[in-house]
Amino acid sequence: MKHLFSLFAAVCLAGTMMAQDYQLVWNEDFTDASLDNQVWNIEVNGDGGGNNELQYYYEGGVKLDVEPTTGKHCLVLTATKEDYMGKKCTSGRVNTKGKMYYTFGRIDARIKFPNTANGLWPAFWQMGNNFDQVGWPRCGETDLIELGHQSAFGKGTQDRYFNGAMHVGSKWDAVWSDAKSVTWPYSVEDTFHIVTMIWTPTSIDMYMDKDAHPELEPYFHADLEPNDNADYDRSIVFGKPNFIIANVAIGGNFPGIFNISNVTALANGPRSMYIDWIRIYQQGNAQETFVCPTASDPIEPENTQGIETVWDDEPGQKILRNGQLLIRRGEHVYTITGQIVK
């Protein structure tokens, strides 16, 4: 994971976010040789995700590679029709549980979703980091985007139909869900798009391509309202640290397909979801939290007061930080508060 920006890119990002007083706290651009296991977990299981999914998730469905059309370095999750561990198909799923988690802020992800046709179910989402302690649905689930729902089958709108959702409850059969589906004006598959969620103590809003279309309303909005029952109190459940998840499921309850022979999306070979980058921004208020191993290790300070060019570690890469106290560990440079800037 590299946290390296050209000065021009950093200024552009800062200018975009300053209007809402958000500052970049985490950038995952997937340019390393392998996935950073200090931050990411690769899931290995064939349990169906609680949704009767068909795939076996394993390491072979996850890699860092170049997206062939754009040349972008990406996290690649690939769904494949093949026999493996008693299943007829495989895929990839990753998460940051127990490693990188945060409370409140803005999260953006630039993703190229596969052609879902009938049968693929790609998603980018998050759950409460207390999952191991309280389980689902008590931990809360927020789906920033899911594609591939059966409602679009037969309408020719699979590439434009998606939803955002929230789920919480006391047990599996007592779940409160709030899901909003939309048929978008244009296709969101097979090219890169930016999915955004703005999460505050009082609300959650989700946007598609907010950078290119700032005038568009959120496709999902929810107020985080209190409730007398703590298991359903959205202000409490969705006011705790969350980790992020990305996956490409095959079949299951969402697409309503339970036999690999009915998964038309894989008829001509594997399909992949490409994630170019993920960024988290925060405002620096007391209610926000952010935890990441690369930002929390003990580090030694170095005073760069008055130094115009700070550390030229790679040819052509210079970070300008006049008059600031930075701290450094390994390949990363941090502000004194622990926010990664390189």
Q: Where are each of the predicted segments found?
A:
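Sec-dependent signal peptide recognition
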Residues: 2-10
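Enriched but not universal
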Residues: 4, 290-294, 336-341
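Boundary of Sec targeting at the N-terminus
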Residues: 19-20, 339
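GH16 jelly-roll
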Residues: 20-300
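Sec/Tat signal peptide C-region and signal peptidase I cleavage site
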Residues: 13-19
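C-terminal outer-membrane/trafficking sorting elements
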Residues: 301-342
